[in-house]
Amino acid sequence: MWKERWFLSTNAKDIGTLYLMFRYFSGLVGTAFSVLIRLELSAPGVQYIADNQLYNSIITAHAILMIFFMVMPALIGGFGNFLLPLLVGGPDMAFPRLNNISFWLLIPSLLLFVFASIIENGAGTGWTLYPPLASIQSHSGPSVDLAIFGLHLSGISSLLGAMNFITTIINMRSPGIRLHKLALFGWAVLITAVLLLLSLPVLAGAITMLLTDRNFNTSFFELAGGGDPIFIQHLFWFFGHPEVYILIVPGFGIISTVISANSSKNVFGYLGMVYAMMSIGILGFVFWSHHMYTVGLDVDTRAYFIAATLIIAVPTGIKIFSWLATCYGGSLNLTPAMLFALGFVVMFTIGGLSGVVLANASLDIAFHDTYYVVAHFHYVLSMGAVFALFSGWYFWIPKLLGLSYDLFAGKVHFWILFVGVNLTLFPQHFLGLQGMPRRIGDYPDAFAGWNLISSFGSIVSVVATWYFLNILYLQLTQGSPVSRYPWLTPQYFSDLFQHLFTRNNSSLEWCLNSPPKPHAFDCLPVQS
């Protein structure tokens, strides 16, 4: 029965598919909110949204939907669940029923957040939930409380999933798949799960204290009662900075796999890649205050956080140059997945360079809360995490569905989206340099030109999204069955197994049927 299969599923592949379906819905709603923002900012003065509180609620909804309900369920929940048991050669996840509740907690979480946005004036706090804006004086209705409960449920879901992934990778590997032979995507999921496990409880503590400040008369962040509103910024960013690596590290694993497969050679410097991801995970916890240069940290503290922040460029640079070295001398196969992977490398590098600018406290005093910051984190998220997501989608979707798609259409989708997001976000660097502040629904006439270009770019991105849904529809209705490994480079490899032998063991999933059977392995594989 389909009800038992989809509502009571304990199969990692089905749960991964549910995660991917869920992220489609959230991603489309989040994209709609972003287009509303850009339409409002397309010209000076009031365009559509006369109420600034409503504008701020839309910004908050866009951020939380995209982070907690689009990127995380797709990269970690979707691809992680579907592929991880296949990559480690295990029968399923370690705790299948825990896996099920990890997904189903996201539905009430999303509903709570939707209610938070539509009850009374909505939660117009930004995703950072800073008091006093998030406190009872400024948001007197239940909206922020509902948003906090929604974040709690989402956090519990992610924590349960993280425990499951860690246990699966440590305990469920087939004979011979040592950790040093684990596929890079497996490593990425492991490091992401550890980051989730360490950072989410801090967020839970922070928003619980905010909840009691709002409703039970405590004064954790209330200056009049002896609290400190800066305290929640430290707590939030101690979670928030690892969170941005939680969003991007699974993308690193996907990009490594895709570039390796489409260059017909092993990843350059496998161990270096693994230790670079580990370093990024560890370093993510030691420079959270670079988000807080403007709150009055003393000069020694700022000097430390500048130095710590700039060190992250080393492991990130190792990864970028290893990807380039993987391409160099390979037989490049420019599939849609490879185009998105190369787009990721270029855009992520640009985002990293603007990050180097923002890491300097003296410069960040000027750039803090301007569109320069918006451009920076959208280059690493909107073109980093999302391009990685599309890259993984185009690479593995023949495996997930067992159906082929139109490669030319996939390439067209890449170019439309690439032009759209660059038109949207590159001008925002200039707006930030000119001093245009974030989270404000109006602006002086001087900023009109770049804003119009940016808003036009967002429409192009929507066209790309529509085109992608069209590709998916045609794949589901007219796609031909996939029988063999679809990404062979014909002039070099005629045989799948020859190809597998050349590429270590990061392709265990391609040894199976497409789509894999519910019980993928009849007997456990053994890695020699």
UniProtKB/Swiss-Prot annotation:
Binds 2 heme A groups non-covalently per subunit. Binds a copper B center. GO terms for molecular function: cytochrome-c oxidase activity; heme binding; metal ion binding. The chain crosses the membrane at residues 17-37, 64-84, 100-120, 146-166, 182-202, 235-255, 267-287, 305-325, 338-358, 377-397, 407-427, 452-472. Its cofactor is heme; Cu cation. Fe(II)-heme a binds at H62, H378. InterPro entries: Cyt_c_oxase-like_su1_dom, Cyt_c_oxase-like_su1_sf, Cyt_C_Oxase_1, Cyt_c_Oxase_su1_BS, Cyt_c_oxase_su1_dom. Heme a3 binds at H376. It is an enzyme of class 7 (translocase). Ca(2+) binds at E40, A43, G45. It is found in: Mitochondrion inner membrane. Its EC number is 7.1.1.9. Pathway: Energy metabolism; oxidative phosphorylation. It is a multi-pass membrane protein. GO terms for cellular component: mitochondrial inner membrane; respiratory chain complex IV. O2 binds at Y245. Pfam families: COX1 (PF00115). There is a cross-link at H241-Y245 (1'-histidyl-3'-tyrosine (His-Tyr)). Mg(2+) binds at H368, D369. The keyword Heme applies. Belongs to the heme-copper respiratory oxidase family. Component of the cytochrome c oxidase, the last enzyme in the mitochondrial electron transport chain which drives oxidative phosphorylation. The respiratory chain contains 3 multisubunit complexes succinate dehydrogenase (complex II, CII), ubiquinol-cytochrome c oxidoreductase (cytochrome b-c1 complex, complex III, CIII) and cytochrome c oxidase (complex IV, CIV), that cooperate to transfer electrons derived from NADH and succinate to molecular oxygen, creating an electrochemical gradient over the inner membrane that drives transmembrane transport and the ATP synthase. This is Cytochrome c oxidase subunit 1. It comes from Trichophyton rubrum. The gene is COX1.
